[in-house]
Each structure stands twice: as structure tokens, then as C-alpha cells.
UniProtKB/Swiss-Prot annotation:
Subunit and interaction comment: Monomer.
Organism this protein belongs to: Sus scrofa
Keywords from the named record: Cytoplasm, Hydrolase, Protein phosphatase
Protein name: 14 kDa phosphohistidine phosphatase
Gene symbol of the encoding locus: PHPT1
One Pfam match: Ocnus
Function field: Exhibits phosphohistidine phosphatase activity.
Amino acid sequence: MAAAADLAQIPDVDIDSDGVFKYVLIRVHAVSPPGTPAGESKEIVRGYKWAEYHADIYDKVSGEMQKKGIDCECLGGGRISHQSQDKKIHVYGYSMGYGRAQHSISTEKIKARYPDYSVTWADDGY
């Protein structure tokens, strides 16, 4: 069974270094025995250029988490524009399948991972 320490080992943010790509906001939590309260959880951001669909990212991440004994749920998706040369990241849009992620949460996570970047978000666009 996964513990809070296992959650701490999971990076909050893993996104590609350049380009415009899809991303998902995922809540990960330790699997708790039936009838017991849910354990600790946290949100993670994952975004990759290789993903044609938001579900491609979630399927890959959820498979990796299950192997570690960690449950997860997709909270929504969107797009990320990452310009590493200009140190800019913009989070926007939504996922047709999962709906719009709370970009404000994603942005806070990204700001912590890239403290010297200008990180912005908007609910518009696709």
C-alpha cells in the first residue's frame, strides 16, 4: 500500500520543454482499504507533445501509478504553450473528453517547478 512518502516521490510537474501540447491535471492518492477514509492526495501536471489525445497522457500516467499502488483520477485538461528560450509558459483551453482543468491549480504547480518563468493562464481557447 502506498503511503504519503510515496506521493512525495512523484514530481508535481512533468511537461515537455518546448512547443504547444496537451496536458492533464491528475489527482493521485494512496489506495486506502475499503471502508476507510481516503488517504493523502495531491495534484500533478503532465503534458507531452507526443499525445494526440488528453486520454493518451492519462492512460500512460495512470498505468505507471497503478504499478506503484497509487490511485489517480483525471481532473481535466487543456493545453500548454512552453517557450523555454523566453522563459514563458501559458496554460489554456480544455479537453473534449475530460473537460477544463482548473488552470489556476496547474499554474501554481508549474510556477513552483519553473520559478524564474513567466507563467500565465486563461480559460479561453482550445
